[in-house]
Amino acid sequence: MQFREWTKELFGRKMIVQHGKVAKQSAGSVWVQFGDSVVLATANISDRTIEGVDFVPLTVEYQEKFYAAGKIPGGFIKREGKPSESAILSARLIDRPIRPLFPKYLRNDVQLIVTVLSVDGNTPPDVTGIIAASLALNISKIPFEGIVAGVRLGYVDGKFVVFPTEEQLEKSRLDIVVAGSKDAITMVEGEAKEVTEEEMVNALMVAHDAIKQIIEFEEEILSQFDVQKMEIEEPKPNETLIGKFEEMISEEELRDKLLIKEKLERSAKLKEYRDQILEKIFEDVEMEDDEKILQESLLKEYFDERTKKLMRKIIIEEGIRADGRKVDEIRPITCEVGVLPRTHGSALFTRGETQSLGIVTLGAPMEEQIVDTIMEEGTKRFILHYNFPPFSVGEVKPLRGPGRREIGHGHLAERALKAVVPSEEEFPYVVRVVSEILESNGSSSMATVCSGSLALMDAGVPIRTHVAGVAMGLIIEDGQEVVLTDIQGLEDHWGDMDFKVAGTRNGITAFQMDCKVAGVGEELLKRALQQAKEARMKILDIMFNTIEKPRESLSPYAPLIVTIEIDPMKVGELIGPGGKVIKSIIKEYDVEISIDDTTGKVSIYGKDQKKVNEAIEYIKTITKDIEVGDVFEGKITRIEPYGIFVELMPGKIGLAHSSKLGEDSKNFKEKYKIGDTIKVIVVNIDENGRIQLGKTN
């Protein structure tokens, strides 16, 4: 295999692509360096066809290697284990733009592995992974129909920045990843700080121009390969059976069943109608069992295709959807707050047949989520988890940990709400939102945004305003384009685009798009985003009517957190030798304490207001400067011939000389014992900080 290398300057960084040096036994492999970030993409396909599946068996793995960032994995085991959430999200980011480009009938296992070998902190390896994946698949024998690329885009000081640095992203109002072909944008994922619809469209156009530049480089590379692609045999339905099917199917009957409003009833009636036709078709047909199974499967696909075409035709020609709505109409919405008596905040958001129960839990600063990835190190104080149990769609499946889809949906909703969450200075709590999807017929991630926003206000979290989300769809047929508002599952499955927009009344906070067709241009995006904005405003009105602003007080079951500031020089005194002082406070007052030794900020967390207040007063007492004239009720720790030593507070001991003990000066050794308490006054503090005490009444 010949070693080849290509280099191009792109967006202030050098991109180097190598082939034929490493992973030469893979069907396709490329080594891509962009800046100082390096990824290796390998693509392979199984020789065996998988029977009984009706989807492309593609697996995309994204491997984060800690050595890439010069780090050793944290924890007891110093080896990379199962993929982190960030790795799963990166795998999804690579998967989404490439999956639609595989042939529909590919039934061989395909595995794409993107391994991160080096990161520079400023060049995102996940986006580089999209470019590497496109190249690896195109130079392999794996059937793959297209060239894709991705970019990350920021918006700093009113200017769009392609592949922004970490420093620029901190100031940016926008952080989106956009992927696409030379002709169209096919995938968008990101968050924003209330950008307008116009700004978002402009961002997508800038991103697409950048994508075209990268694809030109990919085309230059791929022009030097003459690849023989593996042939996929497309199964052909029996023409005689298709003829019988056409004779038996009635468009009027199909329409009646398609336009049933309830999802489960519609699905059941369509299935019943399909099975009746299939049963009649195969009554007098003699064929091998394997062939019969195949033909049944193909006829089921044919039925689905007929139903899909009819759904799209009705939408285009009549402007009516399967559940009877107009194209720009949202489903009926109900909102409730305070539905769970003992949680810190809760809300039930129902939109048509999609329902999310949002729950908020408040925690202490020490309960922050630790983040340790190759790109990021620190903590998170706002967390959102999304759960999609099988009963939400009437299915039976084993309950295991969250899947990739759940992690992805939760991440999108978290990004949508993050824009309105108060700073730590305003609200010192760690905030966890959980969305339990109780039923689903599309757009459950956007229902999560709505239930989460309502639950945050119910919990008394001082969010600036409500955030709502809506999923939009698109039907393109014979040159006609119809944008659908608040799509349900059927429209998501059979439509041409699914894009989710979340935001406030002021602008967009999160955006996700997956497009199945080419040619979604600027004007169509503008129209779709404007329609989404109108829907969002209607949803926000309903949410504000339910709860207008955050509750003024927290739940009585929420923990109390009080933050005070002490002199950073006094932190050592508060902790004490070996943590003795702080441990005694925690035990005595049943509280948790976190200390920022740089700023001197002390957070006291507990469930009993009285004990929290007592702990605060005690901390203030032991960390304040002792001055002449201060009076203390101290404990005697030592008795010497010349006087007694009194502990005024932990670590602070003064001497009451016998001459300062008044009437007890002669018999103090008989009168006092170690452990007795005595009221004393500070009479002097010498230049060495030694405290001199006198007895006071």
Curated annotation (Swiss-Prot):
Residues involved in Mg(2+) binding: 492, 498
UniProt main location, coarse: cytoplasm
Compartments where located: Cytoplasm
Cofactor dependency: Mg(2+)
InterPro entries linked to this entry: ExoRNase_PH_dom1, ExoRNase_PH_dom2, ExoRNase_PH_dom2_sf, KH_dom, KH_dom_type_1, KH_dom_type_1_sf, NA-bd_OB-fold, PNPase
Statement: the UniProt record of this protein carries the keyword Nucleotidyltransferase: yes
Pfam family, one: KH_1
Enzyme Commission no: 2.7.7.8
Keyword annotations: Cytoplasm, Magnesium, Metal-binding, Nucleotidyltransferase, RNA-binding, Transferase
Catalyzed chemical reaction(s): RNA(n+1) + phosphate = RNA(n) + a ribonucleoside 5'-diphosphate
Domain S1 motif: 629-696
Any one annotated GO CC term: cytosol
Coiled coil: none
Domain KH: 559-619
One Gene Ontology term of the molecular function aspect: magnesium ion binding
Top-tier EC class: transferase
GO biological process, one term: mRNA catabolic process
Protein family according to the UniProt entry: Belongs to the polyribonucleotide nucleotidyltransferase family.
Role, per record: Involved in mRNA degradation. Catalyzes the phosphorolysis of single-stranded polyribonucleotides processively in the 3'- to 5'-direction.
Protein name from the UniProt record: Polyribonucleotide nucleotidyltransferase
Lineage: Bacteria, Thermotogati, Thermotogota, Thermotogae, Thermotogales
